UniProtKB/Swiss-Prot annotation:
UDP binds at W352, V353, H370, T375, E378, Y392. GO terms for biological process: glycosylation; saponin biosynthetic process; triterpenoid biosynthetic process. This is UDP-glucosyl transferase 73DL1. Component of the oleanane-type triterpene saponins (e.g. saponarioside A and saponarioside B) biosynthetic pathway, leading to the production of natural products with detergent properties used as traditional sources of soap. Keywords: Glycosyltransferase, Transferase. It comes from Saponaria officinalis. Pathway: Secondary metabolite biosynthesis; terpenoid biosynthesis.
Length: 492
């Protein structure tokens, strides 16, 4: 009887959501996975981007559930290369080869605001899910009468840290950059060295103004979608709701919803290498798709990994700088790579890799990371204790979550925030620190055992969150039901 009733029901028009992503690999991947997650639920999802970014997005979509494609599409806005002085095809911050390209890409994104608005009007969506770096979408959404929801690539904890800092200005109460500050009113006692706060927090810059615009736009938004899950940051989710009054939907880990099946030509050789290693014996090392260390820091990383006594996979982006010629003659990344190949002690990879494929391999037992939110969350989902090496963005906040709150990792001892163009220039982390941190996390001591136990529990909780009845799954249903209600009210 029930099946006959269902068969005669008039199908509802599917919801339509437009997604806007900042053109940088990490942001794009998480937006694609979020759009794919909603597409699984029958939502018509449209990602708006520029032509050069299509191959990355297409590849990311093809690695997910095949049924997603009927509900997920890509629409294009041309990028103004000539107007901003960039060569054709440079439309992504990950493609930057010199510092002056970044502001040109940003200028290009501002130029295409109007054609992007026109395209959104043509699509006539029920909701705009916007990367935080498009604050203009807040007023635009109000203009066309649909909810604008912010997509946050980071978690609740760093958002709460930033709210505490901008509300209470604890950094202004100390004189020296090497002094510690306490972040007031947070659920846990959080201390940070002043020098690890972003430079635009310590001293006003153009980026400070942008962040004020982003914060103001967020407060005018309908709510925030966050790639996290309740059991990871429940106290901070409640804190954020209370201090901002915003609706929050934690829907992660996003990567678990879509069942990403990453493959890459040549990856069979890497898997074969890992298959020959013992359970939990290899540490995975990666600093994301943007960071490039200068030669002297690469040398310290190499020495620290080698002397740790643990096998490793190191995914590296070498700096374009040549460094000191005498040092280059004595040591080079290529020489180290060949040495590790001969000793079978390490795998050095100088290209993009399917990270989840590595993290989920049984031989991987830990991770050395820049603590970018997405990478950190993938490590936690895989049940790996972390060695933290924050560099920029919200990564120093993430380190405090990992080390002080969750207690699932240790830091290498970074003491100063750096911009993308200053990586490895302000501060050099010595091989001794790297070796000691890797030994601690990968060792068999009580502290390491406790970390592994805690992160395994979080891993299980992350998987439970995305199952039917789990917190993230429920939040997705609540979000889509709310959009349906809002659409009905608009059409009434």
């Amino acid at each position: 009887m029930g099946s006959n009733t269902e068969a005669t029901e008039i199908p509802k028009m599917p919801l339509k959501i437009v997604f806007l992503t900042l053109p940088i690999a990490g942001h794009m991947l998480h937006i694609v996975d979020t759009a794919s997650t909603f597409a699984i639920h029958g939502v018509e999802c449209t990602i708006i981007t520029t032509p050069a970014n299509v191959p990355f997005i297409e590849k990311s979509i093809s690695a997910t559930n095949t049924t997603i494609r009927q509900f997920l599409s890509i629409r294009l806005v041309d990028f103004p290369h000539e107007a901003v002085g960039l060569p054709p095809g440079v439309e992504n911050f990950s493609a930057v080869t010199c510092p002056d390209m970044r502001p040109k890409i940003s200028k290009g994104l501002s130029i295409i605001q109007k054609p992007t608005e026109d395209l959104i009007k043509e699509i006539s969506p029920d909701c705009i899910v916007s990367d935080m770096f498009y604050p203009w979408t807040s007023d635009f959404a109000l203009e066309i009468g649909v909810p604008r929801v912010v997509f946050r690539g980071c978690g609740m904890f760093p958002m709460c840290c930033w709210h505490s800092i901008k509300s209470h200005l604890p950094h202004e109460k100390v004189d020296r950059d090497d002094e510690m500050i306490v972040l007031p009113t947070l659920p846990d006692h959080i201390e940070m060295r002043k020098s690890t706060l972003p430079d635009w927090v310590r001293k006003p810059t153009g980026y400070s103004y942008l962040m004020k615009m982003i914060d103001a736009a967020e407060l005018k938004s309908y709510g925030v979608i966050v790639n996290s899950f309740s059991d990871l940051e429940r106290d901070y989710e409640e804190y954020f709701k209370n201090v901002t009054g915003l609706k929050v939907w934690t829907v992660g880990p996003i990567s678990l919803h879509v069942g990403r099946n990453e493959e890459l030509e040549g990856s069979d050789e890497w898997v074969k290498w890992l298959d020959g290693k013992k359970l939990d014996s290899v540490i995975y090392v990666s600093f994301g798709g943007v960071a490039k260390f200068p030669p002297h820091q690469l040398r310290e990383i190499a020495a620290g990994l080698e002397s740790s006594g643990h096998d490793f996979v190191w995914v590296v982006r070498a700096s374009d700088e040549n460094g000191d010629q005498a040092e280059a003659d004595e040591w080079s990344l290529q020489k180290f790579k060949e040495k590790m190949k001969k000793t079978n002690h390490g795998l050095v990879i100088e290209s993009w890799v399917p990270q989840l494929m590595f993290l989920e391999h049984k031989a991987i037992g830990g991770m050395l990371t820049h603590v970018g939110w997405g990478t950190m969350l993938e490590g936690i989902t895989a049940g790996l204790p972390l060695v933290t090496w924050p560099l920029y963005a919200e990564q120093f906040y993430n380190e405090r979550l990992v080390v002080d709150v969750l207690k699932i990792g240790v830091g290498v001892g970074v003491k100063e925030f750096c911009g993308l163009d200053d990586i490895g220039k302000k501060e050099t982390i010595g091989r001794e620190n790297i070796e000691a941190s890797v030994r601690l996390v990968m060792g068999d001591g009580e502290e390491a055992a406790a970390m592994r136990l805690r992160v395994k529990e979080l891993s299980e909780a992350s998987m439970k969150a995305v199952r039917e009845g789990g917190s993230s799954k429920a939040n997705i249903h609540d979000f889509l039901n709310e959009l349906s209600t809002l659409r009905s009210l608009r059409q009434a």
